[in-house]
């Protein structure tokens, strides 16, 4: 997302940009992801950066039924608390936030994409991958069946299912770091060509 880069730390110093509140972060990333398709008329404009209203099912599928009503409100509150929780292990927080986005689907559309952007933001903000160069969403694109299986495991709510999801997320971050290293080597070697 366009806003994501503005929240990343300065690589040459100790300055840290002011971070948005968890609700503002969710809204901004959702606006970045869904805004263009709303402008094209594919999604109602009032669905952009706003949680789904009670009684409205998400358009996109996911692992099992999405919560609604009070259950949706409670899970969304838990998600925002998790994003803002200080001192949580970076990998576990990123995995849980992503898992909640895919499982709860708090928005009408764009939940998985926002979840993947949140991973990138959180691992950078929390120092797991402080450069912000990693592209952990590559793994989901390359291995969609494994992504779906891991999401279903998380949605099961079992200990083993959640562990499987965290392991999948760790693999995704590792693949994203390897992809970033390959891009950096290409740039350093001067082997990129425009257009």
Where are these regions (language model features)?
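FIC/Doc superfamily catalytic core
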Residues: 1-195
């Amino acid at each position: 997302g366009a806003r994501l880069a503005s929240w990343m730390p300065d690589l040459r110093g100790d300055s840290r940009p002011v971070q948005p509140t968890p609700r503002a972060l969710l809204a901004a990333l959702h606006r970045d992801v869904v805004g263009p398709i709303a402008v094209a008329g594919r999604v109602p404009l009032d669905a952009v950066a706003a949680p789904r209203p009670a009684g409205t099912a998400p358009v996109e599928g996911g692992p099992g039924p999405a919560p609604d009503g009070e259950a949706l409100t409670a899970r969304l509150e838990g998600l925002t608390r998790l994003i803002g929780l200080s001192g949580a292990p970076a990998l576990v927080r990123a995995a849980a936030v992503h898992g909640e986005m895919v499982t709860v689907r708090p928005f009408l559309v764009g939940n998985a994409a926002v979840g993947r952007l949140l991973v990138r933001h959180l691992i950078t903000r929390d120092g797991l991958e402080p450069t912000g160069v990693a592209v952990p969403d590559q793994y989901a694109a390359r291995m969609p069946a494994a992504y779906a299986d891991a999401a279903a495991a998380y949605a099961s709510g079992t200990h083993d299912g959640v562990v499987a999801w965290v392991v999948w997320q760790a693999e995704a971050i590792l693949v994203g770091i390897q992809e970033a290293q390959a891009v950096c080597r290409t740039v350093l070697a001067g082997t990129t060509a425009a257009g």
